[in-house]
Amino acid sequence: MMATGSCGDGGGAQQAKRTDFTIGWSIYAGWMPWPYAQQAGIVKKWADKYGVRINLVQVNDYVESVNQFNAGKLDGVTLTNMDALTIPAAGGKDTSAIILGDYSNGNDGVVLKNAKSLSEIKGRTVYLVELSVSHYLLARGLSSVGLKLSDVKTVNTSDADIVGAFANPAATAVVTWNPQLGEVAKLPGAAVAFDSHQIPAEILDLLAVDTATLKANPNLGKALAGIWYETIALMQRQDAGGAAARAAMAKMAGSTPQSFDAQLSTTHLYGTPKDAVAAIRSPTLGSTMTKVRDFSFSKGLFGQGARSADAIGIGLPGKTLGDAKNVKLRFDSTYMELAAAGKL
């Protein structure tokens, strides 16, 4: 059984109050504020304020981090909107997205060798993390040039292995995210043929927490929101302190400060809690999640028992997409709103 077992309505299983929590993260520009906050003492400051202990743990493989969350080994994890839906939510784990951090605005891309346009991808073998946002981006790109997923062959490749795979002269198409995207785009003959700035606000980067754990321990949500907004305010400062914070994040991500700043330029950060609350309350989120769930269902990611894209309910502020009796992914603005109101 899952260590943070959750089932049923509204977060399900009754949870005892706890003080120790583990949050997983993987390397991505929009998630580097988390490990930096731990190093800089910001995690301890907010955790102490709310009487909890929060340990941030790096997982080298992104999909593995989401699987660990799904298996109850982590109380929360950094992940995308699509992966929150297709891994924990589709697996029956009631999951709450409590921080809307950013959207990918060029941080995810399709790279081709020796091609002038995306249409030349037809018939090629494409290396990517299958059934992830990379697969979604590929589908959106293909449809923009009148092609379908059946026009290409895909090979499942871990984000940790993707640069090496594309370095092979026989590999001519890849879909990945930064920092790997910047690496593969530098290879001889390579060029980005389609990227996420062409589908703004569709690939969302989140912090999600087990709903039952959050319900029993609301101070965890408050501490996480406090940590996040203090850290990203520092990160955005155009002074020596901001530059030092970004340089430290770059080092943790295995990037140079220049490369990290370039990655941030293709990340649309919701830079204040007010911005994030506006985004989570916008009708755009509903239309994005409709596209994402329709794609996910079409790829069989809701499991064999799912009869339609409505099988898994998605809770949005003020409304539910799909089955209101089976809500498994919740976009919960509570803690962002507390931050926006200065009430943390």
Task: Give the role of each language-model region.
Residues 1-19, 327-344:
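Short, low-complexity disordered leader/linker segments with a strong preference
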Residues 293-344:
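Conserved C-terminal helix/tail region of periplasmic/extracytoplasmic solute-binding proteins
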Residues 59-63, 128, 132-133, 160, ...:
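Soluble non-cytosolic domains of exported or imported proteins
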Residues 216-305:
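Secondary-structure end/capping motifs
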Residues 101-111, 187-213, 217, 221, ...:
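Periplasmic-binding protein-like
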Residues 74-78, 162-187, 209-210:
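Ligand-binding pocket segment of bilobal, Venus flytrap-like solute-binding proteins
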Residues 12-157, 172-178, 191-194, 201, ...:
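Short, glycine-/small- and polar/acidic-enriched structural segments
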Residues 66-67, 119, 163-164, 182, ...:
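Alpha-helical segments flanking ligand/cofactor-binding loops in enzyme cores
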